[in-house]
Amino acid sequence: MESFRFVHAADLHIDSPFSGIGDVDVRVANRLREATYEAFQNLVELCLKSDVDFLVIAGDVYDGADRSVRAQLRLRDGLSRLADEGIQTFVVHGNHDPLDGWQSSIAWPEGVHIFGAAPEWKNIEKNGEIVAAVQGMSYPTREVTDNLALQFSPPQSGSIFTIGLLHANVGGNSAHPNYAPCTVEDLSTSGIDYWALGHVHTRQTLKRAAPVIAYPGNIQGRHPNETGERGALVVDVAP
């Protein structure tokens, strides 16, 4: 297997308003209004500068189900920059941006893969060789209380690296709604090598040995309780 690199991001919440900040100067307000867009552009730059092979986004790409046209266009433009450099993107939607929300008829670039409500495998090639496969599924509606992890199918081959892309509450984290609840054990027995999770906004690695189970946290704090470093995970995989 050839080595490769990918970025694991989640909870972009593009176009999210800030809460709990009161009245601020108009210049500060404008900066805050643009903050999630700037954070997304920083994510795109990270992918380009890090020479990654692909990007996975584990849900809550947008802040609301009825996502704005502006947010969708900015997402498309950013992912187009990646596609132009041969970097594929794999996306699932979460509780903030489920599939039944409104969206405009924007044509996504080739190389952008948005998963539906049923789990599906997508192969990833590098230099003509399949090096990895991603399986993901999106929320059909906002409040998903089923254990989606149990719906993922086992890998079709043991010779390639596999990634599960899921927006879920693992272990009943009380700081977040208990959507798509599952356990570390559910994920550990799946046969998948790396679980790329979203939903929890604080970076956490729930399991470091195979399979790796990780939350990257969100890329931009959205209220006074979300402070400190934010960003995404750069993951290197070697034979």
Residue ranges of each PLM-predicted region?
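N-terminal active-site segment of His-dependent metallophosphoesterases
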Residues: 1-73
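His/Asp/Glu-rich metal-coordinating catalytic cores
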Residues: 54, 65-214, 218-236
